[in-house]
Amino acid sequence: MTPELDHLLSQLSPATLENLEPRLRFGLSCCERVEHLLEHPEVISCVQSFRDLMQSSKALEEHMELGARATALANGHHGSRSLDGVGHAAVSATYACAAAMSGRPRQAAEYVAYAMVYGQGGYGATQEPDSFLPEYRWLEQRLQSLVGVG
């Protein structure tokens, strides 16, 4: 993680009711970033429910139920049998969405970066740490634009 992204995320800690909405707005952006990598229909349904929640006037605290459901699905993910690591992107994307829906932006950002890099092939994730930089920059820009921190 870049120092800039780390600094931005630290502004959303500790988790409070006052920063719940910005944490969840960034979380939704994280979900949408990796949504194309998701495999499990129930996780995809959770993302849609999360999107609906964020667009409605419902109590945002309902996100915890979605987060718990997505976490259970992530923990039960069968993983990947592919040798190139691309299949691991679905696992990381599922964990990214679970963290995002649970209001944990730092963990969501970390999993988003892994999912996007794994989605390009496993080599970069294990052998080229710089392959994460474009994703970290994207996350920085999204966090700044969505929640106005920085």
Task: Identify the role of each PLM range.
Residues 1-150:
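Structured binding/interaction patches within domain cores
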